[in-house]
Amino acid sequence: MGGIGIWQLAIITVIVILLFGTKKLRGIGGDLGGAIKGFKKAIKEDNDKDSTQVDDKDSTQVDDNAKQPSNKKVEENIKEQSKEKDRA
């Protein structure tokens, strides 16, 4: 009872067509479709851009990790330094 029925939607549709005309409605539909297409394209480009930035960051982190000495080497250096201090 409180909802909009099929007949009410049909009457609203007829009134809209009479007010705007079919040519304007087609134009509005085309403009709306173009806007949606552009929006989807922009989102896809943004996602592609983000994924390439993530790939660049991953490769940079790998390079940084390659430059850092391993824990074993650090521990060996610390032991050698402490032995040298003990000798001195």
Curated annotation (Swiss-Prot):
The keyword Transmembrane applies. It is a single-pass membrane protein. GO terms for cellular component: TAT protein transport complex. Keywords: Cell inner membrane, Cell membrane, Membrane, Protein transport, Translocation, Transmembrane, Transmembrane helix, Transport. Residues 46-88 are annotated as: Disordered. GO terms for biological process: protein transport by the Tat complex. One of its GO terms (molecular function) is protein transmembrane transporter activity. The keyword Protein transport applies. The chain crosses the membrane at residues 1-21. It is found in: Cell inner membrane. The Tat system comprises two distinct complexes: a TatABC complex, containing multiple copies of TatA, TatB and TatC subunits, and a separate TatA complex, containing only TatA subunits. Substrates initially bind to the TatABC complex, which probably triggers association of the separate TatA complex to form the active translocon. Belongs to the TatA/E family. Part of the twin-arginine translocation (Tat) system that transports large folded proteins containing a characteristic twin-arginine motif in their signal peptide across membranes. TatA could form the protein-conducting channel of the Tat system. This is Sec-independent protein translocase protein TatA. The lineage of its organism: Bacteria, Pseudomonadati, Pseudomonadota, Gammaproteobacteria, Alteromonadales.
